[in-house]
A protein has these predicted regions:
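Solvent-exposed soluble domains appended to multi-pass membrane proteins
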Residues: 1-173
Length: 173
């Protein structure tokens, strides 16, 4: 009952928000997303007994959630497929034609070139299959991702030149 009530209330609030913001003159983008499935019971039993997922908590389907992006200035429907949580903002900015910071541009390139997601040792391939091992190309992108994150948080900008993204850094100035 609690889960169903939560779904009903979230749906009602989504309706109120979109109704309100559809009347606003300024551009608005709303992003609705949950970071995990509700286990409903212990060990995700309802998902495994229904055949939706395997009996392993590592099953990628148990870690995918629905994502909804809504805007009051675009009614284009897009199926995003599976993307990592860290790609939500870059994908949203690209879809709605917003200027992206360097880091988001890198994530967009990685999403198109290497994999749909790389989280906790599980790789979601571009074709939707999963793997636990990175290809050499994926390893290169993963290493560059780590290097860029480290450099942006603690470094002095060394990663920008190494990744061939100097022109993006100049555009951001």
């Amino acid at each position: 009952e609690d889960f169903a009530t939560g779904i009903r209330d979230a749906d009602a609030m989504l309706g109120k928000l979109t109704e309100y913001f559809s009347q606003v003159d300024e551009p608005v983008i709303l992003v609705f997303w949950g970071d995990h499935y509700n286990p409903i019971d212990s060990n995700y039993d309802i998902y495994t007994r229904s055949g939706y997922a395997s009996d392993s908590s590592a099953d990628p389907r148990l870690h995918q959630t629905t994502l909804l992006m809504w805007s009051n200035y675009s009614d284009r429907a897009v199926d995003l497929g599976t993307i990592a949580a860290y790609d939500i903002s870059p994908v949203m900015m690209e879809l709605f034609g917003l200027r992206q910071p360097l880091y988001f541009q890198f994530l967009g390139r990685q999403l198109r070139a290497a994999y749909r997601a790389n989280t906790r040792g599980t790789i979601m391939e571009k074709d939707g299959t999963t793997s636990n091992e990175l290809t050499p190309l994926q390893q290169k992108w993963s290493d560059e991702h780590w290097l860029l994150q480290y450099d942006l948080m603690f470094g002095k900008g060394y990663a920008l030149g190494r990744m061939g993204l100097e022109e993006l850094a100049e555009d951001a100035e």
